[in-house]
């Protein structure tokens, strides 16, 4: 992150911490790649000061919408879990595929958000798209708050990619990349290894 990184982090946390997060996770147990997805003190910069060195404000990962109600969840919970969370195992496993796919890549530490915010719905076909102007106003404000400059935007799935392609101007990003959604189980993406291979190919990473 640029400029005053700590100040910028706190602004993002206070303004969008309920709906966004960062592509940083704890390491899983060796025998279970879906473990250790909870945030605990991960985003507490007093207890984890090394966190700020990992964060990137010019890479943005974008999902579609929340799949569940998120009232009273801790800051930066999105794409993670937390102690006491009764998240569905499949949902947690799918999110852990993101961690596995991006670990050790230049995209680790990216900012993560959803286009449709505050609309929990597990079935994407039921998501309300009647307020897209406001959704994209908020998204642009996120980018401005991040001080993102011509960011690389990674869209999880074709629905998100199409929305971004249709509503953003080409000069608002340097690259817009569609990657397979982490809930996708075909084309070898059912496993963590298969999903990583697919995503790295789509990102043109050897």
Predicted regions and their residues:
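A polyanion-binding, active-site-adjacent surface
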Residues: 2-151, 160-162
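Short, flexible coil/linker elements and helix-boundary hinge sites characteristic
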Residues: 16-17, 169, 204
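General "foldedness" signal
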Residues: 73-76, 124-126, 167, 188-196
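Short beta-strand scaffold positions
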Residues: 155-156
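Short alpha-helical interface elements
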Residues: 163-164, 204
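Short, aromatic/basic amphipathic alpha-helical patches
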Residues: 164-171
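Short, flexible loop segments at boundaries between secondary-structure elements
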Residues: 172-206
